[in-house]
Amino acid sequence: MSETPQKRLYIKTYGCQMNVYDSERMADVLRPLGYGIVDEPEGADLVVLNTCHIREKATEKVYSELGYIKQMKGRKAEAGGQMTVAVAGCVAQAEGQEIMRRQPAVDLVVGPQAYHQLPELIARAHRATGERLSADFAADEKFDALPAERQVSGVSAFLTVQEGCDKFCTFCVVPYTRGGEWSRPPEQIEDEARRLADQGVREVTLLGQNVNAYDGGGYTLARLVRRLAKIPGLDRIRYTTSHPRDMGDDLIEAHGELPELMPYLHLPVQAGSDKILKAMNRDHTAESYIRLIEKIRQARPDIAMSGDFIVGFPGERDGDFEKTLDLVREVGFASAFSFKYSRRPGTPASAMPGQVDEAVKAERLERLNQLLDEQQKAFNILQVGKTMPVLFEKKGRNPGQIVGRSPYLQAVHAVGSEDLLGQIVPVRIESSAKMSLGGVLETQPLPEPA
C-alpha cells in the first residue's frame, strides 16, 4: 500500500518573535492534515504569510510578496495543481477585507488569535463556500485548541505566555491587532515547557507583548519563572518584551537570585524626552526609567540591557532628540533596536500635529545608531578575557566551527566538535565584533553558581 504524498506547506514569517512562535504552532495545527514544511513557495500546496503590522514598510512587503505568490499560483494551476494562499498575523487582523479585495489570489485570512481555525478555513476555501476570514479575539480558545505536542528543532525555543496589550501607546497598533492583555494558565505553560525540555530544549524565551504584565491566576511573571526554573533539563530562561511600568520588585529579585534567568533584559524606553514620552502615553519618565535600570543593576550587576527607540515621533524637536542621546549615554546599552517613527492608520499619533520630515528622521536615526553601535562594541570588548557558559546551537560557516549563545545573547563562535551542540560549555572569549564574540573551549568546567 503506497503512502499518501505529503502536502507541501510554506510559511513566511514577518516581524516579532511571537510571530515565529505562531508560525511553528500553525505548522503543528496543519501537520495532522498531512502538511510538511518546505523551504520555498514554488510548488507549495499551501502558502501562509504570517504578517507584521507594526510599520508601514512591513505591511507593504506583504502586498508585494502576494504579487509573486499570485504568479506562482497561476503557474501551478496551469500545470493542473492547486495552491491555497493564506494571510495570517497582524496585517490579516487589521486589513482582512482589504487584503481579499486587493489580492484575489488570497483564499483565506486569519488573525493571530484564530489560527487554530486554519483547518476549517482551508476546507471552506477548497469548497469555495462559507466565510474565509476569521479575526476573532479568542486567545484562550486558541491555546486550548492547539496540539499539546510541538515539533521543535534545536535547543532553544520560544514559548508564548501572554498576548495583547492594555497600554495603548499612541504610536502602536498592537492593542488593535492582538487585543487586550491575556495570560495563559501557568499549568498550561509548564506543561509545554516540560514537553520542550523532553525534546532536548535547554533554553526557552517567554513571549508576550507585555510579558512582565503576566497575570496567570495569581501568578506573576516572577513566580512563573521560578516555577519553570525547577524543570529538569531547562537550564536557561529569558523573556521579552517588557514594559517599564510592569517591572515589579519580585521580578527584579528573581534576576538576582535565579541562575536560570539569564542576565539579559530587553526593556524598551522609546525616547529620552519626557514631553515625547507623555505624547506617546508611555506612563513613565526618562528619570524613572534610569532609576529602574539602577535598581535592576543593583540586583544583577552584570545584566546586559537592551532597549527600543523611536526617532521622529510627532512633535520631536532637536532638543527632545538630544535628550534621547543623553539617556542612552547614561544607561549604556549592550544592544538596542531603533526605528524611524512610522505613521500607522487608526493610532492617535497618526493624527498628531508636528509630523517630522523623513530626512530629519533619517539623520536622527543615523546619529542614534552610531552611538548605540559604539556601546554594543564596547560591551562586547569587555567580555574579552572572560570565561562564560555558552549554549552551542549549530554548526558555523567555517569548517570545524560551532556557534552558540552567551548568557548576554551574543553569538559566540568557537572551534569544536559537533558533539557539543546542545551542550553548555565554558568558553574563554578571545575576540569581539559588533554582533558576536570569538573564543576557545575551556578544558576545566565552570564553577557551580554560588
UniProtKB/Swiss-Prot annotation:
Domain TRAM residue range list: 381-443
Residues noted as binding [4Fe-4S] cluster 1 in the record, renumbered to the chain: 16, 52, 90
GO molecular function: 4 iron, 4 sulfur cluster binding; metal ion binding; N6-isopentenyladenosine methylthiotransferase activity
Record's keyword annotation contains Cell inner membrane: no
Enzyme Commission identifier(s): 2.8.4.3
GO (cellular component) term, any one: cytosol
Record has Cytoplasm as a keyword: yes
Catalyzed chemical reaction(s): N(6)-dimethylallyladenosine(37) in tRNA + (sulfur carrier)-SH + AH2 + 2 S-adenosyl-L-methionine = 2-methylsulfanyl-N(6)-dimethylallyladenosine(37) in tRNA + (sulfur carrier)-H + 5'-deoxyadenosine + L-methionine + A + S-adenosyl-L-homocysteine + 2 H(+)
Positions of [4Fe-4S] cluster 2 binding: 165, 169, 172
Domain MTTase N-terminal, residue spans: 7-127
Primary location: cytoplasm
Comment on bound cofactor: Binds 2 [4Fe-4S] clusters. One cluster is coordinated with 3 cysteines and an exchangeable S-adenosyl-L-methionine.
Family annotation (InterPro entries): Elp3/MiaA/NifB-like_rSAM, Methylthiotransferase, Methylthiotransferase_CS, Methylthiotransferase_N, Methylthiotransferase_N_sf, MiaB_methiolase, rSAM, rSAM_horseshoe
Cofactor: [4Fe-4S] cluster
Domain Radical SAM core: 151-378
Location(s), subcellular: Cytoplasm
Coiled coil (residue ranges): none
Entry keyword set: 4Fe-4S, Cytoplasm, Iron, Iron-sulfur, Metal-binding, S-adenosyl-L-methionine, Transferase, tRNA processing
Cited function: Catalyzes the methylthiolation of N6-(dimethylallyl)adenosine (i(6)A), leading to the formation of 2-methylthio-N6-(dimethylallyl)adenosine (ms(2)i(6)A) at position 37 in tRNAs that read codons beginning with uridine.
Subunit structure: Monomer.
Family: Belongs to the methylthiotransferase family. MiaB subfamily.
Protein's name in the database: tRNA-2-methylthio-N(6)-dimethylallyladenosine synthase
Source organism: Caulobacter sp. (strain K31)
